[in-house]
Amino acid sequence: VLILKSSIGNRSLGWDLLPPGSPRHEVETTNKKTGEKITLVTPAHNDEVRHASWTKGEVPAPPKHTWHAGLQYLGDVARAKDVLKNLGKYYPDATEYEVAGFLWWQGDKDRYNAAHATVYGKNLNQLFKALREEFDAPKAKMVVATLGQTNKDTATGNEKLIIDGMFAFGDKHKGEAAVVYTNPISMGSSSNAHYGGNA
């Protein structure tokens, strides 16, 4: 069994890890400062607007950075494919492989963007589809782990949107995907603090 792990932090599914095929989304939310209802737009994969989200009708000026929606996804997939292409380097005499599945434990950065949190489930569905296509693994399974600090019964706001999106994903893909509720086994602290060194 070969496990390929990408565990860079501070990345969101709604921006950095956004998979190919992801469209723009419009999300109605409330401006925290003014209390007014606003519509946020999330980018499509490799969108020409290189911002994580923006207010509808107010496209921001291009940023100085060259980052775009999905760039981390592209890099992660390319590095995994490179390992598989050179499999014999890591497993001498190995000539073929089968991608059996994917494990996803993420969501911390998406908590800080209402638009990303709202469409988390949609993005997760697209991620599963894209990964199966990328690795020519149409029957590969997926396991999604929730954020340890999020209690499914008491969660509110963006955390509730994300955990609900995760469970909706699991319900949609019964038999193909499963969701692991990690709150009962969490050892304290939170994802942005790496669970106090217990991540």
Located regions from the model:
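Cell-envelope and extracellular/periplasmic
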Residues: 1-199
